[in-house]
Amino acid sequence: MKSEQQSAFLIGVVGVCASGKSTLIRGLESRGYRARHIAQEHSYVKDMWKRITNPDVLIFLDASYPVTVKRRQLNWLEADWAEQQRRLSHAREHADLAIQTDQRNADEVLAEVIQFIGEFLAKGQSNTTPQA
């Protein structure tokens, strides 16, 4: 059941292509959370994640180059993946939670995020994403 606090709370999700962002967001939304994909991996503006969405909490999902290629059959070079990592560096530094998804399935990632959000909300924190 969705609580008032939960529905007012905004979760931003960033990460490299094929790291599991869309899957995580669907899982969060199905449980009553507001979550937004922030396409930071495609932006040259290092703090776009903050300017566009300014989430209450920022989740960073990472995946290695070989795993991203396997998951989505992406037609890209390791240099493209490295460029996304570079573009995401500011968001990674400011993330409230960072998860390496190579060895985790979608349910494990979702469970970790929900546990983190529960603890975060229990502490009464909001709008605590560090300032740039």
Feature-to-residue mapping (PLM):
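Conserved substrate/cofactor phosphate-moiety recognition/catalytic segment
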Residues: S3-Q6, V16, R26-D56
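Conserved glycine(s) of the Walker
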Residues: G20
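Conserved phosphate-donor/acceptor-positioning beta-strand/loop module used by diverse small-molecule
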Residues: N54-R71, I99
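Walker A (P-loop) ATP-phosphate-binding motif of ABC ATPase nucleotide-binding domains
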Residues: L10
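Small-molecule kinase domains that catalyze NTP-dependent phosphoryl transfer to phosphate-bearing small molecules
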Residues: L74-E112, K123-A132
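Hydrophobic anchor at the beta1->P-loop junction of P-loop NTPases
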Residues: V13
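Conserved Walker
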Residues: T23
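Catalytic phosphate/metal-binding cores of nucleic-acid and nucleotide-processing enzymes, i.e., regions
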Residues: G118
